[in-house]
Amino acid sequence: MTAAYANLFSTIAPKDFGRVAVLFGGLSAEREVSLKSGNAVLTALQSAGVDAFGIDVGADILQRLLSEKIDRAFIILHGRGGEDGSMQGLLEVAGIPYTGSGILASALAMDKLRTKQVWHTLGIPTPRHAVLRSEADCISAATELGFPLIVKPAHEGSSIGMAKVSSASELIDAWKAASTYDSQVLVEQWIHGPEFTIATLRDQVLPPIALGTPHTFYDYDAKYIANDTQYRIPCGLDAAKEKELMDLTAQACEALGIAGWGRADVMQDADGKFWFLEVNTAPGMTDHSLVPMAAKAAGLDFQQLVLAILAASVDADGKKEARG
């Protein structure tokens, strides 16, 4: 552990967190990942002595929240219904403190188009893009942006529904496929160069991780299944570029109102410029996940990490107006 990260450790006695509901599963396309993340978090909290129990979130969640004795909630739902502000809203109505970002920041970060609009307004570099609603939009985007491009559902995570395309026909096919996940589909310039992911914890930026994969990009298989994905930490940047990346990450997260914890995904082009893609407000916590890797580099093991995330919910008590 370096002195820079010494204040990340929770100083709260495990029993003082009260009864903690770990919210996982849900109904989104990322349900299976959330189940793995949730079980890992629940096991770590219970091993630390926290009075924690799990809720696999379903249609009865409002009734569960109102009928159970819950002192605070650890949100480890991925995707819609968990990262989009809706669960945060339910918890605020129920008067239950929770981990992570607030309603507005969660909704903004879940919406890739709105995220890009905020960043563009504030001068945070993000790839050029277009919204696809028709085949005509695909042709127009191809002319304006050129190839290759990457197609993304606007409200999905874990790279679900994403595809790299190199022709108009591929773009149209990818738009149709992405439309099965989301009514709003984006297409972005493809940035040639290395990819980085940078976690934040309690308003501090953790050591960046460089990603390497034989896949076309860091897709669902590379994230959760493959054993050939490469992670470099230290990330290989020189000190000045690493500081630039970490400073930009802090600005990008602050622009969206990210609180508690999160993870930004960034590309670097051939000229060394960084391009911000998105921020995850409840990132994965599986054995393949990136936030635990970054936390380990900062000196926190998995149990210490989940306690630090939970402690941030205490930091936010009574400060809901300051949350995003």
From Swiss-Prot:
Its BP terms in the Gene Ontology are:
cell wall organization; peptidoglycan biosynthetic process; regulation of cell shape
Task: Identify the Gene3D superfamilies for this entry.
Answer: 3.40.50.20, ATP-grasp fold, A domain, ATP-grasp fold, B domain
Q: Specify the ATP-grasp domain's residue ranges.
A: 116-311
Q: Which reaction does it catalyse?
A: 2 D-alanine + ATP = D-alanyl-D-alanine + ADP + phosphate + H(+)
* Keywords attached to this entry: ATP-binding, Cell shape, Cell wall biogenesis/degradation, Cytoplasm, Ligase, Magnesium, Manganese, Metal-binding, Nucleotide-binding, Peptidoglycan synthesis
In the record, what terms sit under GO molecular function?
ATP binding; D-alanine-D-alanine ligase activity; metal ion binding
* Obligatory cofactor(s): Mg(2+); Mn(2+)
In which residues is Mg(2+) 1 bound?
265, 278
Residues reported to bind ATP: 142-197
User: Which locations, inside or outside the cell, does it occupy?
Assistant: Cytoplasm
**PROSITE patterns assigned to the protein according to its UniProt record, in alphabetical order:** ATP_GRASP (PS50975), DALA_DALA_LIGASE_1 (PS00843), DALA_DALA_LIGASE_2 (PS00844)
Q: How is the cofactor bound?
A: Binds 2 magnesium or manganese ions per subunit.
What does UniProt give as GO cellular component? Answer: cytosol
Binding positions for Mg(2+) 2 per the UniProt entry: 278, 280
Q: What is its EC number?
A: 6.3.2.4
- Which PANTHER family does the record match to this protein? D-ALANINE--D-ALANINE LIGASE (PTHR23132), D-ALANINE--D-ALANINE LIGASE B (PTHR23132:SF23)
HAMAP family cross-referenced by the UniProt entry: Dala_Dala_lig
Which NCBIfam families does this one have? D_ala_D_alaTIGR (TIGR01205), PRK01372.1 (NF002378)
Can you name this protein? Answer: D-alanine--D-alanine ligase
Q: Which organism is it from?
A: Pseudomonas fluorescens (strain Pf0-1)
Q: What does the record give as the organism's lineage?
A: Bacteria, Pseudomonadati, Pseudomonadota, Gammaproteobacteria, Pseudomonadales
